[in-house]
Structures are given as structure tokens and as C-alpha cells.
Amino acid sequence: RAAGRAASSVLEMIGEHVQPGVTTEELNQICHDYIVDKLDCIPAPLNYGGGGGQMPFPKSICTSVNHVVCHGIPSSSKKLKNGDAINIDITVIKDGYHGDTSKMFFAGEGSVMAKRLSKITQECMYRGIEQVRPGARLGDIGYAIQRHAESNHFSVVREFCGHGIAKVFHDDPQVLHYGRPGTGVMLEEGMSFTIEPMINAGKRQIKILPDQWTAVTKDHKLSAQWEHTLMVTADGFEIFTLRTEENFG
């Protein structure tokens, strides 16, 4: 809970800094300093992964701009332009627990399509969250997300999913953002996991860039993502990463 609140506070803090002309490395540095100095937390992505020939993730946040689906690496050469859509993904470790959350921002005025994709993607996340209660199944979550995305003529990325989270960053269960109702793991009180749909304006296919992390849409059309960390409660759910701006839950 404390880790979730800490992570959501980073997203609340960084919004005013997302402006045309800022680099994604500058956003990374602002978030890193805030996480470490203000919150006394650890940025979980920094040096995460590696092994199997993959380099560890070199930065403290993920910055995924426009057609980048997820895991964009902050760079001093990536300057935001007016109209750019950017997902900022924050994971912090507080007292051994992880809080993981992301949201979409716009540098200046986003395009009509980017704003619509972002809005529908956030709605997809909320539709998924609304399924969460003891006795529901993971397929119910995936189905709710997929149905809302596809009914708006968007597509669901299948290579990445939500995940169990607590003392481990990525744990079981795998929370797919597509599926059939009544299938998959049954939810039980006390389970904690993320719901983090990645929705594409075009086709769902993606590819990984040579940096081994950055995922982009194959057709170069826009992608959006929103994410919360939540827990199954006796009568539903509690979102650990809810922000004050949200009227949900």
C-alpha cells in the first residue's frame, strides 16, 4: 500500500515537467531524484533484468513515446515534440514491496487520435479492474479489456501482460489483457497484481528494437498504456496506486 502510494505520487509530480523540448532522460532524472531523495524508495527498473544476453535495464523509469508500446529507455537524445504522447511507467520499492503504475501524458496538445486511444485504453484498464473480486477468473479481466478495445476498432498487445506483484517485481499470476470469460486462475482475497493493457491504434503486432528492451508497433501506429497495482479484497478490490485526480474505485 505504501509502495503504491509512493509510485502514484511520482506520476502526480512529473506531469508538469512533460512539455515540448524536454528530453526523456531529463524526465528520468527528475523521477529518479524524487524517488530516491523525497520518497526514500528504490527505483525498481534500474539495472532490472539482464541475463540470457540481455543488458539490464539502464534507467529508473520507462518512457514510451507515440508508437513505442512499452519499456522505452530514457535518452538525452529523445526530445519531446508538441503533440507527442508518452507513457511514463513507474515502479518503486518501499520496505521491500513494489508499487507499479503508469499513465499517458501529452507534450503540448495531443492529436485527436492519440487522446482517443489514451482515453479508451484507460477505460479498458478500468473495465478490467471492475471484474476483480474473489471467485472471478483472470479470463474475465482479459475479456472485458479486449471487448472494449476491439469494439472501438483498436487492438490488444498480447506479448506483455499484467503480473503478480508484492515482494517480487514480476510474479505469478500472468494477467492477460485478452481472453474468455470464466477461464484462467480464480481470484482469491489477498492476491495482488497489476492490470496494464497496451492498446494499439493499428494492428496488435509488435517488435523489439536492437536495444533488447524497447517494444514498438510493427505498423508504426500509436500505442497507449495505463497501469495500476491492486489487491483482491473480500468484496472486490483495492487499488494501491490510485491518484487523487481519478474518480474511480
Language model region names:
Residues R1-G249:
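Active-site neighborhoods and metal-handling regions in enzymes and metal-associated proteins
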